[in-house]
């Protein structure tokens, strides 16, 4: 953009040339200094036409604005005889003809594209119809899809059931382990209690083992009962010495079951009386040592009587 301006003196005409490739934009006209009240009527001449563009006066309109564009040569003049008139504006590059041709070609292309759009619209309608048919075809196979969905649901249910079975098995395994732990604890406590029971002592006289007693557990108040085995009595030379074993009294004549194992009733104690007889006095003793002790005592008694 280039600024432009000129002075038109009284009674004269000025030619204006925008220049090649430019247009001239007339923006403003102003009246010069004047001592008298004077009016100036302005004219523009293009080719053979002369046009009035405005009037300037010292009192009312000393200047006036325009919005006029010229793309070729023109002439400016006014009617004032005492003062000059000043015109201002600017020049702008004019668009080339090639650009205009491009714009025209674009317009033509747009006009040509209109029927193509219609044809494409028809083709699009055909495509839409074909797509609708394609959509309708899978809709017929919807039962198959439903069956597949049902199969998937059944598979999921089976997996859920299997998971639940696994959790149940794990719970049962834990419960069985806990039961084993409890039973092992009970066995340990029973072993400890059996260790607490006194063991029978061997008799000083004789080599024969005394009768063993068994321990029974009675369900009194959900507690384990203990049966103490008595120690064997010393027979130190007494006649008819025998070991007395305390036998537990069974509850209501029934055997007690512990850990799915029945406990047998205790063995009967051996009868009193020995197996070695004394011929002179027809007495029997448990062992030969007892018989020898008896014979010694008898011999001592006879010697004391003789003395």
From Swiss-Prot:
Bias-annotated ranges (Low complexity): 265-277
Summarize subunit and interaction data from the UniProt record for this chain: Multimer. Isolated as a trimer composed of 3 proteins of 39, 42 and 45 kDa, possibly a homotrimer with different phosphorylation status or a heterotrimer with HDT2 and/or HDT3.
| Activity's dependence on pH | Optimum pH is 7.5.
Q: How is activity regulated here? A: Inhibited by 3-(4-Aroyl-1-methyl-1H-pyrrol-2-yl)-N-hydroxy-2-propenamides. 3-(1-methyl-4-phenylacetyl-1H-pyrrol-2-yl)-N-hydroxy-2-propenamide 1b and 3-[1-methyl-4-(3-phenyl-2-propenoyl)-1H-pyrrol-2-yl]-N-hydroxy-2-propenamide 1c are very potent inhibitors.
Enumerate the subcellular locations listed in this protein's record, separating them with semicolons: Nucleus, Nucleolus
Give, as residue ranges, the zinc fingers classified C2H2-type.
276-299
Gene that encodes the chain: HDT1
Q: Compositionally biased, Acidic residues: which spans?
A: 98-112, 151-197
Q: Give GO terms: molecular function aspect only.
A: hydrolase activity; zinc ion binding
Choose any GO biological process term that the UniProt entry carries and state it.
Answer: chromatin organization
Write out the GO cellular component annotations: nucleolus
The family database entries (Pfam families) matched by this protein are listed as: NPL
Say what the protein does: Mediates the deacetylation of lysine residues on the N-terminal part of the core histones (H2A, H2B, H3 and H4). Histone deacetylation gives a tag for epigenetic repression and plays an important role in transcriptional regulation, cell cycle progression and developmental events. Able to deacetylate all 4 core histones.
Q: Where is this region: Disordered?
A: 98-280
- Cross-referenced InterPro entries: NPL (IPR041232), Znf_C2H2_type (IPR013087)
**Name of the protein in question:** Histone deacetylase HDT1
Assigned protein family:
Belongs to the histone deacetylase HD2 family.
PTM statement from Swiss-Prot or TrEMBL: The N-terminus is blocked. Phosphorylated. Required for enzyme activity.
Q: Which UniProt keywords apply?
A: Chromatin regulator, Hydrolase, Metal-binding, Nucleus, Phosphoprotein, Repressor, Transcription, Transcription regulation, Zinc, Zinc-finger
Positions with biased composition (Basic and acidic residues): 119-132, 198-211
């Amino acid at each position: 953009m280039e600024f432009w301006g000129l002075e038109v003196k009284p009674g004269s005409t000025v030619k204006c040339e925008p220049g090649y490739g430019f247009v001239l934009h007339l923006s403003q006209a102003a009246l010069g200094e004047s001592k008298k009240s004077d009016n100036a009527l302005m004219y523009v001449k293009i080719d053979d036409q002369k046009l009035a563009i405005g009037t300037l006066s010292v009192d009312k309109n000393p200047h006036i604005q325009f919005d006029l564009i010229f793309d070729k040569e023109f002439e400016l003049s006014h009617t004032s005889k005492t003062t000059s008139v000043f015109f201002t504006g600017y020049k702008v590059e004019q668009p080339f003809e090639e650009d205009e041709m491009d714009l025209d070609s674009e317009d033509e292309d747009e006009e040509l594209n209109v029927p193509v759009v219609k044809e494409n619209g028809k083709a699009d309608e055909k495509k839409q119809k074909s797509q609708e048919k394609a959509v309708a075809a899978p809709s017929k196979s919807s039962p198959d899809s439903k069956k597949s969905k049902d199969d998937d649901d059944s598979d999921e249910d089976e997996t859920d059931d299997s998971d639940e079975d696994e959790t149940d098995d794990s719970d049962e395994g834990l419960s069985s382990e806990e039961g084993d732990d409890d039973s092992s604890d009970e066995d340990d406590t029973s072993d400890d209690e059996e260790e607490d029971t006194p063991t029978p002592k061997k008799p000083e006289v004789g080599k024969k083992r005394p009768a063993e007693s068994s321990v029974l557990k009675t369900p009194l108040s959900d507690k384990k009962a203990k049966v103490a085995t008595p120690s064997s009595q010393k027979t130190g030379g007494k006649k008819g010495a025998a070991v007395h074993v305390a036998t537990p009294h069974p509850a209501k004549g029934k055997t007690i079951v512990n850990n799915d194992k029945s406990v047998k009733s205790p063995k009967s104690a051996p009868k009193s009386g020995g197996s070695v007889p004394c011929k002179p006095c027809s007495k029997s003793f448990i062992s030969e040592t007892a018989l020898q002790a008896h014979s010694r005592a008898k011999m001592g008694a006879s010697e004391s009587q003789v003395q």
